[in-house]
A protein has these predicted regions:
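Bacterial Sec-dependent N-terminal signal peptides
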Residues: 1-25
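Extended soluble regions of mature proteins
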Residues: 18-238
């Protein structure tokens, strides 16, 4: 299953060598309120050294690297493999925080208007294929430089989905019966800000964002930032 998306993409690329590239992204989660060790229910009598170690581990766990491989009509987005964490020296404090396992590859075909995502459910691997719709981006008359590229701003309003509303309602019902240690915030509409460059004429970007007149180099969500650190292009034969 893990080879399916790669095979789809490589096969197509063999017929579309005129323009392709790779964009490397770095993402990090933004924490609105400082999360403390005692919030996890571990121990309320925490010394400053452990609190500092926890904050550093939390920061590292929220940072991930991704690779977007693309041509003019397709792209594949995947999380890069993380290096094994070095073992702590004897006597040093070490805290590890993990949010989730490695994410599956995401493949988009702009011609077919479909997206394919690898996912694992109950230990079995699945390939989920869904139709894609072009987001209703609002282009903003504002620009800035990201590396060597001139980028332009765009905004996207993402309303709360019915699924999110239902999940929150179910959480509230469970809270009435048995309060949970972890709280769920009420979902709200959110505004996504993107920075794209027409200098790279593809309509793709990180994390399934697409539909702008140029490669997306930066995404700002309320609690997540995705930045492009490097772009490698191969336009031989164009």
């Amino acid at each position: 299953m893990k080879k399916i998306l790669l095979l789809l993409f490589v096969t197509t690329f063999s017929f579309a060598q005129e323009f392709q590239g790779k964009a490397y992204y770095f993402s990090k989660t933004i924490f609105n309120d400082k999360i403390k060790v005692e919030d996890t229910g571990v121990n309320k009598d925490i010394d400053p050294a452990m609190e500092k170690a926890f904050q550093e581990a939390l920061k590292k766990a929220s940072e991930k690297n991704y690779l977007l491989t693309f041509n003019k009509s397709e792209c594949i987005y995947e999380q890069e493999q993380q290096l094994e964490k070095p073992k702590s020296v004897a006597g040093e404090m070490s805290i590890s925080v993990s949010f989730s396992s490695s994410e599956g590859k995401k493949y988009i075909n702009a011609k077919d208007k479909t997206s394919s995502t690898e996912d694992e459910i109950f230990g079995k691997e699945f390939l989920i294929v869904e139709p894609i719709e072009k987001p209703n981006w609002e282009l903003v008359d504002e620009s800035k430089k990201i590396g060597d590229y001139t980028c332009f701003k765009a905004k996207l309003l993402v309303p709360v989905s019915e699924k999110q509303k239902k999940e929150y309602e179910e959480f509230l019902k469970k809270e009435e019966i048995k309060p949970s240690l972890f709280k769920m915030e009420e979902p709200k509409d959110k505004t996504i800000t993107a920075w794209y460059t027409p200098e790279i004429p593809v309509s793709f970007g990180p994390n399934n964002y697409l539909g702008l007149p140029g490669l997306i180099l930066e995404i700002n969500e309320p609690e997540l930032i995705i930045l492009c650190s490097k772009v490698v292009l191969n336009t031989k034969g164009a």
